[in-house]
């Protein structure tokens, strides 16, 4: 049986645990606490560039399909904003300096896989990323600016939805669009399940960054200890 459904509510309720787990990854907790390492952050932006490029390419590919069309909003696209940030953090030749991390490769491979086999599952990834960006974007922007002493919007274009004037209203309309998609019960369950996978894929990226951040601190401490053992060193 195919019918209109409260997909937005089912996605929210069905991902509550995964959402909470993602927020409790050490990297995310540190970020929310105002501890932001520039090297780790710019790798995060690079990772997101590859993820959003995959999502947006595949969404565009299916934009006229009956299932994808209701939630295809170009004003949500993050790729160009991420390119702006990447130029800020890496310089004009940023394309030669960035690469997807191992966890990011798994993520983008998943996007391309479901686009080929079950494109309706792209809904889950759009829900997970875009609604999250709209909901917490301004808070994360302020944290990023404060932690890295940024001003004038430099390095935080990712959080700006310039073509969306009223984010609260847009989110409400997006949820209504989700609810308008004609889906079977089994399709809804698959989409909710895929949304949980999306959260886990994001967690893997955050965990990877946390591990790299710890390595950076360890190297810094090791070098500092070596320095204080050198003859003539003064603290």
Swiss-Prot record:
Top-level EC class as recorded in UniProt: oxidoreductase
Record-linked InterPro entries: Haem_Oase, Haem_Oase-like, Haem_Oase-like_multi-hlx, Haem_oxygenase_CS
UniProt superkingdom: Eukaryota
Pfam family, one: Heme_oxygenase
Keywords recorded for this protein, A-Z: Chloroplast, Heme, Iron, Metal-binding, Oxidoreductase, Photosynthesis, Plastid
Catalyzed reactions per annotation: heme b + 3 reduced [NADPH--hemoprotein reductase] + 3 O2 = biliverdin IXalpha + CO + Fe(2+) + 3 oxidized [NADPH--hemoprotein reductase] + 3 H2O + H(+)
Residues the entry annotates as binding heme b: 19
GO CC terms in record: chloroplast
GO molecular function: heme binding; heme oxygenase (decyclizing) activity; metal ion binding
Subcellular location: Plastid, Chloroplast
EC number: 1.14.14.18
PROSITE patterns assigned to the protein according to its UniProt record, in alphabetical order: HEME_OXYGENASE
GO biological process terms, semicolon-separated: heme catabolic process; heme oxidation; photosynthesis; response to oxidative stress
Keyword field contains Secreted: no
Keyword rRNA-binding in record: no
Disulfide bonds: none
Broad class of where this protein is predominantly found: plastid
Family membership noted in the UniProt record: Belongs to the heme oxygenase family.
General function of this protein: Catalyzes the opening of the heme ring with the release of iron. Key enzyme in the synthesis of the chromophoric part of the photosynthetic antennae.
Protein name: Heme oxygenase
Organism this protein belongs to: Rhodella violacea (Red alga)
Source taxonomy: Eukaryota, Rhodophyta, Rhodellophyceae, Rhodellales, Rhodellaceae
């Amino acid at each position: 049986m195919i019918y209109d459904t409260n997909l937005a509510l089912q996605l929210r309720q069905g991902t509550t645990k995964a959402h909470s787990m993602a927020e409790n990854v050490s990297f995310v907790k540190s970020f929310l606490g105002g501890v932001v390492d520039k090297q780790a952050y710019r790798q995060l932006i690079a990772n997101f560039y590859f993820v959003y490029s995959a999502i947006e390419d595949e969404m565009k590919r299916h934009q006229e399909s009956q299932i994808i069309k209701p939630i295809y909003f170009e004003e949500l696209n993050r790729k160009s904003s991420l390119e702006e940030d990447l130029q800020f953090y890496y310089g004009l030749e940023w394309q030669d300096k960035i690469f997807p991390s191992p966890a990011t490769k798994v993520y983008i491979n998943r996007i391309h896989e479901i686009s080929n086999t079950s494109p309706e599952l792209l809904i889950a990834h759009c829900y997970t990323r875009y609604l999250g960006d709209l909901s917490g974007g301004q808070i994360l922007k302020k944290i990023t600016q404060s932690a890295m002493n940024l001003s004038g919007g430099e390095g935080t274009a990712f959080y700006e939805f310039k073509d969306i004037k009223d984010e609260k209203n847009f989110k409400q309309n997006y949820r209504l669009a989700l609810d308008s998609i004609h889906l079977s019960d089994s399709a809804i369950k698959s989409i909710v399940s895929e949304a949980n996978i999306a959260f886990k894929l994001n967690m893997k990226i955050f965990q990877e960054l946390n591990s790299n951040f710890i390595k950076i601190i360890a190297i810094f401490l090791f070098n500092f200890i070596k320095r204080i053992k050198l003859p003539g060193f003064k603290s």
